[in-house]
Amino acid sequence: MAHSACGFSVALLGALLLGTARLLRGTEASEIALPQRSGVTVSIKLGNPALPVKICYIVMSRQHITELIIRPGERKSFTFSCSNPEKHFVLKIEKNIDCMSGPCPFGEVHLQPSTSELPILNRTFIWDVRAHKSIGLELQFATPRLRQIGPGESCADGVTHSISGHIDATEVRIGTFCSNGTVSRIKMQEGVKMALHLPWFHRRNVSGFSIANRSSIKRLCIIESVFEGEGSATLMSANYPGGFPEDELMTWQFVVPAHLRASVSFLNFNVSNCERKEERVEYYIPGSTTNPEVFRLEDKQPGNMAGNFNLSLQGCDQDAQSPGILRLQFQVLVQRPQDESNKTYMVDLSRERTMSLTIEPRPVKHGRRFVPGCFVCLESRTCSTNVTLTAGSIHKISFLCDDLTRLWVNVEKTLSCLDHRYCYRQSFKLQVPDYILQLPVQLHDFSWKLLVPKDKLSLMLVPGQKLQQHTQERPCNTSFGYHVTSTTPGQDLYFGSFCSGGSIEKIQVKQNSSVTLRAYAPSFQQEVSKQGLIVSYTPYFKEEGIFTVTPDTKNKVYLRSPNWDRGLPALSSVSWNISVPSNQVACLTVLKERSGLACQSGRAFMIIQEQQSRAEEIFSLEEEVLPKPSFHHHSFWVNISNCSPMNGKQLDLLFWVTLTPRTVDLAVVIGAAGGGALLLFALVLIICFVKKKKKVDKGPAVGIYNGNVNTQMPQTQKFPKGRKDNDSHVYAVIEDTMVYGHLLQDSGGSFIQPEVDTYRPFQGPMGDCPPTPPPLFSRTPTAKFTAEELAPSSPPESESEPYTFSHPNKGEIGVRETDIPLLHTQGPVETEE
């Protein structure tokens, strides 16, 4: 208890002492005296436009004021009415230096008055130097040098340098700088304005720069940036992010050790509307035979440069009506030359027409420490952090990078076939070319965009090795995988991510699709040669996709609906063709008990159909409980058809299939064998009885005379009349009904209506067609159909070839109509002879 009281007393005493110190600091008197003809003016003003609740005043001669100005030759004493004046007031010390009427005070610039003579406020020292247009002024900065910052950025220690120049009467901002950078000198012409901002807690008492006299530089300014080792610098054009002055020239000089290499990359730029001349950047590169080298701002900038070089930005004469703005922000990266920079790689895209290859940095976050950049160089000179190689050319590239794992390659290729008559049954292989695998940079994505004629053909993907669908229950752990997406206009349907080592034999997609090979580990280069997708064009089908699955006897096969976590698109249908070996039994299990789907219009169904017996079960996904685990002895279909769901009610289904060996009951086998033996014994008895009865009933043969039989020898007949006088050249038509009419009569004597088949497009052998869902707006309950009672939607088909017979007609057969109407359900039309 005593210890706690003691601690509280110490804390209270510290707070009182701190408050007393702040109170004394605010109430103690300050005195500022400025020498005559010093050119220095001191002003104390309120810093924030919105005054706080408790107003703080400057107290001078018992007067409370909010602004105080001290001019050369004046001495003033004052105090503050509050204990924290640094939160209310700012101090500005401005010195005007006239180099036009007299000599300039060149050399080190001092802080006048010194910081020890000033009250503890946020301070800004301003030096405004005016000179003739023909005189150049140079600001030299001591170590540590300056680092330019962009708009919205701040310095860690709060100390900033703002530098401006003059073009006639117009002030031009050169930039804002912090400490610890590479900028060592800034050369100006026609005067310079330098502002040093010091926070109230900073005890700095030197300016940190000096002014020197130079000859005319014939441009707006020259900024010198010195690199003593590896590092980077970000620099901006004058007035950035505003517009660069019209038709002006600005130069940056870079000092780089000879053993290091420098690369330039433009981070942000805009060009204006030029009437005359052209906006450009010019490089003076040591050893170049074409100095200066001229580039447009849109061009790839030089890289891998050894030693010092200059970069200049040249403006143009802008359009008076619509000038636009010219601005530039760029980065210079200096680093050690890498071994890869001496190697050249050939990328031959001369035979390609629809392929592009991009080398770019991986999205990795770096800390504050310097990280050497990674550049891709074309022809060893034009370097950039990312390069896109287009089709139709041979490209020579090299790398300026200390760690090539920080880069990766993305490739896109379009494969299209627009003539469905030519495309049908055509196939090709999706495989990564060898020249891409030989690059020292790892492949990230290789995307094939597959285009087919609309509503004419569909696509089928057949892998070299069966695929596994990536799920949370069984994730893919391979070095690469495939992402399959249907790219139908207006609807992108993501089928999922697949890897080798599964049970999916083929994937059929209705329309245009995108297949992306994504590499996850460098070892994929050794494994990808074993894999490959064969793409072929197949007859068009209406479902979004069809998966052909042959389950593994050792593992579960997990399958989930497309667009997982986003829901199957409205009014779309997907099927799975699941094969079951003859000696196995498949168990189908759905993960959820209910789908949680709510339809706005239409109905959603899940159909399970046996392919051999055509028996099927139909489940309403909106109203009913999803099917419980079911066993299937033969191959079967699983179909999911979606409705138009309500917002937030999406359709996602996950199910799996397992195989177990088929077992046979011994009692059933014995019973079947016994039944077969009894049946065979009964057949033998029946045959013996029939033969014995025939022998008893058999009598002697009896001859029968038939007087209607012609017993004369056949002779050649002659026509009693001429051809013109008889109808021997007219033939009667014998209908099938007159020959086979007795076969068309039922037990009642009436003729049976002929069976007329309808044309159906060929869809392969039995089992290749997924089940057809009920109409979208029907209210069909769950129905089960057996082999003896087929579903109405599946009419029986005869295995033999169907014949169609016309009905018999009581009228006479016309002699002029000899065609038999094979597909007509009515009798032949009567005609007059």
From Swiss-Prot:
InterPro entries, per database record: CDCP1, CDCP1_CUB_3rd_6th, CUB_CDCP1_1st, CUB_CDCP1_2nd_5th, CUB_CDCP1_4th, Sperma_CUB_dom_sf
Pfam families cross-referenced by the UniProt entry: CDCP1_CUB_6, CUB_CDCP1_1, CUB_CDCP1_2, CUB_CDCP1_4th
Annotated TM spans: 667-687
Protein's cellular compartments: Cell membrane
Residues glycosylated per entry: N122, N180, N205, N270, N310, N342, N386
Site, Cleavage: residue positions: R368, R369
Topology within the bilayer: Single-pass membrane protein
Modified residues (Phosphotyrosine): Y731
Ranges of residues in domain CUB: 417-540
Free-text description of this protein's post-translational modifications in UniProt: Phosphorylated on tyrosine by kinases of the SRC family such as SRC and YES as well as by the protein kinase C gamma/PRKCG. Dephosphorylated by phosphotyrosine phosphatases. Also phosphorylated by suramin, a heparin analog. Tyrosine phosphorylated in response to dissociation of integrin alpha-6 beta-4 from laminin-5.
Residue intervals annotated with topology Extracellular: 30-666
Stretches of the chain forming a coiled coil according to its record: none
Top-level taxonomic group: Eukaryota
Cellular component aspect of the GO annotation: plasma membrane
Keywords from the named record: Cell membrane, Disulfide bond, Glycoprotein, Membrane, Phosphoprotein, Signal, Transmembrane, Transmembrane helix
Basic and acidic residues bias spans: 809-819
Complex and partners: Interacts with CDH2/N-cadherin, CDH3/P-cadherin, SDC1/syndecan-1, SDC4/syndecan-4 and the serine protease ST14/MT-SP1. Also interacts SRC and PRKCG/protein kinase C gamma.
Descriptive protein name: CUB domain-containing protein 1
Organism of derivation: Mus musculus (Mouse)
UniProt lineage: Eukaryota, Metazoa, Chordata, Craniata, Vertebrata
Gene expressing this chain: Cdcp1
